[in-house]
């Protein structure tokens, strides 16, 4: 795809590039967007693509995020550089395909790769790998990164960060909306017609579904939810999983693979495990039930639930959500002309714009931070 500026508009809105890899570590999403001068009301996706991880690097990152690998300082330094290199390569590859010049892009917003998220305790922290100095050096583009840590330092969860972006592009004065990102972890943004926006993680989504599927198949994910559809929900297993006290915590709350991983599931499978397909069906139902329960408790008069992330392509999961939410319109954000696969990458491009424009990127009503904060560190080109 070649991108050309409109000759009738000599001062087009600036371009930004967002980079995102989530808890599933299933690829690096790169999104080139044009954001209007206010960085509030309009964010146009110009081009996007997903770059595959090196398989060995992906395995190491998954092990780290699940606490299965204790890396040395040398290994962590090497991984930080490798992730930075992978992100820079993803950015440069997309830019080359568009035909634009690097100098036309005002900034890159890079999420990095989360390897640990500990928002509770005496000294909370969150840690994302991906050397932003290296990204700026290899792309020649100012890079804004490390968005979550300032919110954590201000007493917040550091997550989710997308609600401010969701409000900017999907808020409505006519109906109560919610945005559901079905990535590795499911998270909700609640956007009422009036009142504060809320946002929080609801529990596992693709992280568990993909991991269980990969244990029994060569492919990386359950295409169209077919494997889950071939099984039956095991109510006993579902009840055991739902008994985890994390699900009853009130917002603000966030989680990750360190909380919800395959060992968490397999501990509940003894002494007589259900069939693999039944476990897949039960994990899918777990996602649907926890999302629906959270939505009905926190915003019971929701009119519309807009879905993004990989789960938006899973018709079985979409159907289960609709079944649990009969009075809510459940639909993909594709209905609004937005690509469900790249909304988060677009969001980090938007966050970069917010930071460079001196505007806050967090919502204290979502994260629990003490106030609005500029997010991220700026690494000049």
Curated annotation (Swiss-Prot):
What single Pfam family name could you report for this chain, choosing any that match?
Answer: AnmK
Pathway, per UniProt? Amino-sugar metabolism; 1,6-anhydro-N-acetylmuramate degradation; Cell wall biogenesis; peptidoglycan recycling
Swiss-Prot/TrEMBL keywords: ATP-binding, Carbohydrate metabolism, Kinase, Nucleotide-binding, Transferase
Q: Which reaction does it catalyse?
A: 1,6-anhydro-N-acetyl-beta-muramate + ATP + H2O = N-acetyl-D-muramate 6-phosphate + ADP + H(+)
Q: According to the UniProt entry, where is the signal peptide?
A: none
Family affiliation: Belongs to the anhydro-N-acetylmuramic acid kinase family.
HAMAP family annotated for this entry? AnhMurNAc_kinase
What protein does this entry describe? Answer: Anhydro-N-acetylmuramic acid kinase
Q: What is the lineage of its organism?
A: Bacteria, Pseudomonadati, Pseudomonadota, Gammaproteobacteria, Lysobacterales
């Amino acid at each position: 795809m070649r991108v050309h500026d409109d000759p009738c508009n000599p001062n087009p809105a600036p371009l930004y590039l967002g980079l995102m890899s989530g808890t599933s570590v299933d690829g690096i999403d790169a999104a080139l967007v044009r954001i209007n001068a206010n960085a509030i009301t309009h964010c146009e996706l110009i081009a996007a693509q997903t770059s595959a991880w090196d398989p060995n690097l992906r395995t190491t990152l998954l092990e780290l995020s699940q606490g299965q690998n204790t890396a040395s300082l040398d290994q962590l330094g090497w991984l930080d550089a490798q992730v930075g290199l992978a992100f820079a390569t993803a950015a440069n590859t997309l830019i080359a395909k568009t035909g634009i010049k690097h100098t036309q892009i005002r900034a890159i917003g890079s999420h990095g790769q989360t390897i640990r998220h500990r928002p509770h305790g005496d000294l909370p922290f969150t840690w994302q790998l991906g050397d932003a100095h290296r990204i700026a050096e290899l792309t020649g583009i100012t890079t804004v990164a490390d968005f979550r840590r300032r919110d954590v330092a201000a007493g917040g969860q550091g997550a989710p960060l997308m609600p401010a972006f969701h409000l900017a592009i999907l808020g409505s004065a006519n109906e109560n909306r919610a945005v559901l990102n079905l990535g590795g972890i499911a998270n909700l943004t609640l956007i009422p017609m009036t009142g504060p926006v809320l946002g929080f993680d609801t529990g596992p989504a693709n992280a568990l579904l993909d991991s269980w599927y990969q244990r029994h198949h060569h492919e990386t994910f359950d295409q169209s939810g077919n494997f889950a559809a071939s099984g039956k929900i095991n109510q006993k297993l579902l009840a055991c999983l739902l008994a985890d006290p994390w699900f009853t915590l009130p917002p603000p709350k966030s989680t990750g693979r360190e909380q919800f991983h395959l060992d968490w599931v397999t501990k509940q499978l003894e002494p007589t495990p259900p069939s693999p397909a039944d476990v897949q069906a039960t994990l899918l139902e777990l996602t649907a039930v926890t999302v629906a329960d959270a939505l009905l408790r926190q915003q019971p008069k929701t009119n519309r639930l807009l879905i993004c992330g990989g789960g938006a392509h899973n018709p079985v999961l979409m159907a289960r959500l609709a079944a649990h939410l009969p009075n809510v319109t459940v639909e993909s954000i594709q209905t609004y002309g937005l690509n469900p696969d790249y909304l988060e990458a677009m969001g980090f491009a938007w966050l970069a714009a917010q930071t460079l424009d001196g505007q806050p990127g967090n919502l204290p009503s979502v994260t629990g931070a003490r106030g609005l904060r500029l997010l991220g560190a700026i690494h000049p080109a």
